[in-house]
Amino acid sequence: MKTPITEAIASADSQGRFLSNGELQAINGRYQRAAASLGAARSLTNNAQRLITGAAQSVYTKFPYVTQMPGPTYASSAIGKAKCARDIGYYLRMVTYCLVVGATGPMDEYLVAGLEEINRSFELSPSWYVEALQYIKGSHGLSGQIGNEANVYLDYAINTLS
């Protein structure tokens, strides 16, 4: 999995050299942001159920047909609602994984690669998940550097789905 740190090391190693001052500064910057990133990951994890439930409700409010249409891809039944919450939780987990590693690698490798095909195969609308992630971004209650770190990866997921 690529992170700014592993990329700097791979570049230096492939050239048979030590890390440059610029690379060391970039790595140091990552370590300085790491505490905020871990704080954001911890908070999102601790509040996951509340955020997922609220995000699902936001989807149902914005797209009421989701709860009215029958079928396995809609939330008209308890099973459908559970699937919706599960999927929102998956996106939120990916955001927390990105926060831990300090890069979009987890999302790129585990989510983005097959996202379009999955959504098309299961007739899932990306706009549902955009709404859910926007809700989470607006409701996570994080501020300062911790909030900024969380929002970087929430925005990345939103932009990927848009």
From Swiss-Prot:
Binding site residues for (2R,3E)-phycocyanobilin: 84
Location relative to the cell: Plastid, Chloroplast thylakoid membrane
Signal peptide start and end residues: none
Gene3D superfamilies, A to Z: Phycocyanins (1.10.490.20)
Pfam families named in the record: Phycobilisome
Regions that span the bilayer: none
Keyword Electron transport included in the entry's annotation: yes
PTM entry text: Contains one covalently linked phycocyanobilin chromophore.
Membrane topology summary: Peripheral membrane protein
Major location category of this protein: plastid
Highest taxon of source: Eukaryota
GO BP terms: photosynthesis
Keyword terms: Antenna complex, Bile pigment, Chloroplast, Chromophore, Electron transport, Membrane, Photosynthesis, Phycobilisome, Plastid, Thylakoid, Transport
GO CC, one annotated term: chloroplast thylakoid membrane
Family per record: Belongs to the phycobiliprotein family.
The protein's assembly and partners: Heterodimer of an alpha and a beta subunit, which further assembles into trimers and the trimers into hexamers. The basic functional unit of phycobiliproteins is a ring-shaped hexamer formed from two back-to-back trimers contacting via the alpha chain subunits. The trimers are composed of alpha/beta subunit heterodimers arranged around a three-fold axis of symmetry. The phycoerythrins also contain a gamma subunit which is located in the center of the hexamer.
Task of the protein: Light-harvesting photosynthetic bile pigment-protein from the phycobiliprotein complex (phycobilisome, PBS). Phycocyanin is the major phycobiliprotein in the PBS rod.
Name of the molecule in the record: C-phycocyanin alpha chain
Protein's gene: cpcA
